[in-house]
């Protein structure tokens, strides 16, 4: 009948297992020697162990031939071991480098904290001890992963930094309302004469006035003693100073067209 549970299990592919090895396993597992179940010639089991799942606290495997510790047998050891249980493999050195081979098999079998060390017995027979633990989590277990939510990057605002008021950069002269020059005024004083490099049109107007033999006063403030001067040439006498000029209203500046006197040029 198959056993249901054991505090510790010692297996070997040989006919017998030394009591010293059983004592070492009991000490490592923290149990008495009587609580250790021993199985010899494990290769004849066909890679199966007569124990229920997660029913053994610790396992010691004393292997003479590395090929007897196959992947199937390591999977079986992992099945019967409790979560977090220890497995200790003792093997003799050989040309097949059992240290590297067994370590790799244990890692591929899901064991963790795999550590190897050299040891020697009282009869000076050298061996390799490889210790590992079964993971505390169950094979095939799953758990939800929390996806990190990406928020908008936070802008670090330095409260000590002061914002500059744009208005404070303006001077008093900048705030003054600009004074636009009077249209037609060259700003040459009370005489209001055109300047040398006149560009406002005053020089042309003065030239027209000179050709008419009229004063600026007569152009800017025309008056008529007879009352007919402002009506046009049809009503003006032969000696009228405004003869040839367009009609105007007394007291209002006479508007001379741009092509006035063009025929005289």
UniProtKB/Swiss-Prot annotation:
This is Anamorsin homolog 1. Monomer. Transmembrane segments: none annotated. Its cofactor is [2Fe-2S] cluster; [4Fe-4S] cluster. Residues 226-240 are annotated as: Fe-S binding site B. Keywords: 2Fe-2S, 4Fe-4S, Cytoplasm, Iron, Iron-sulfur, Metal-binding, Mitochondrion. Component of the cytosolic iron-sulfur (Fe-S) protein assembly (CIA) machinery. Required for the maturation of extramitochondrial Fe-S proteins. Part of an electron transfer chain functioning in an early step of cytosolic Fe-S biogenesis, facilitating the de novo assembly of a [4Fe-4S] cluster on the cytosolic Fe-S scaffold complex. Electrons are transferred from NADPH via a FAD- and FMN-containing diflavin oxidoreductase. Belongs to the anamorsin family. It comes from Oryza sativa subsp. indica.
């Amino acid at each position: 009948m198959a056993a249901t549970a054991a505090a510790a299990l010692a297996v070997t592919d040989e006919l017998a297992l030394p009591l010293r090895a059983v004592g070492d396993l009991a000490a490592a597992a923290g149990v008495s020697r009587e609580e250790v179940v021993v199985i010899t010639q494990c290769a004849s089991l066909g890679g199966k162990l007569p124990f229920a799942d997660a029913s053994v606290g610790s396992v010691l495997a004393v292997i003479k031939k590395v090929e007897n510790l196959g992947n199937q047998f390591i999977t079986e050891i992992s099945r019967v071991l409790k979560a977090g249980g220890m497995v200790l493999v003792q093997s003799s050195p050989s040309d097949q480098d059992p240290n590297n081979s067994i370590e790799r098999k244990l890692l591929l079998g899901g064991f963790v904290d795999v550590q190897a060390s050299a040891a020697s017995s009282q009869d000076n027979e050298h061996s390799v001890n490889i210790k590992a633990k079964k993971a505390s989590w169950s094979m095939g277990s799953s758990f939800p992963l929390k996806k990190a939510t990406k928020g908008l990057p936070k802008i670090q605002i330095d409260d000590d930094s002061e914002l500059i008021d744009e208005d404070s950069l303006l001077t008093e002269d900048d705030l003054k309302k600009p004074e636009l020059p009077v249209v037609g005024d060259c700003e040459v004083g009370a005489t209001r004469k055109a300047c040398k490099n006149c560009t406002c049109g005053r020089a042309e107007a003065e030239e027209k006035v000179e050709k008419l033999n009229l004063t600026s006063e007569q152009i800017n403030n025309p008056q008529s003693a007879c009352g007919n001067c402002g009506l046009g040439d049809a009503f003006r006498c032969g000696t009228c100073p405004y003869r040839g000029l367009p009609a105007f209203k007394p007291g209002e500046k006479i508007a001379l067209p741009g092509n006035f006197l063009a025929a005289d040029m």
